[in-house]
Amino acid sequence: MTEIPGWLSTEIRTGDAIERLASKLKEMSAEPSRAFFARDAENILQSGAVVLVGSRYGVMGLNCGWCGFPTCAEKTGQAPLAPCAFNTNDLGIAVGSAVSVAADHRADCRVLYSGGVGALALDMLPGCRAALAIPVSATGKSPFFDRKPL
């Protein structure tokens, strides 16, 4: 696992790890609100690699109020398990940068919330509380383009 200074971690998974992640998503798709996880599992199986980007939770000490509390100390005291707004903001920036690099190299990819949930359930990003998955494909046609509707 690569730890980016601050709160972010990344992993690149291939082979059996892709199979495990897809299997976990299929299992999780039994819950009605997560039926789309089964479709996303198929996309993961069509990829050569999955990039995982995760964030640990911790306050940045900026007292910005974006979390709904006036100070970081109040947020930590009253909602210690809630993310600092900057934790998820930084996660989004990192994922945007990763898919941009993939596009620059003409690799097809898609950002999957479901893959991040599955990766967290499998503890693929130890210590992280939020994650997104980016399946990557280098085939003739993008498997992420003509996704079947639910």
What kind of region is each of these model predictions?
Residues M1-L150:
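Acidic, surface-exposed loops and disordered segments
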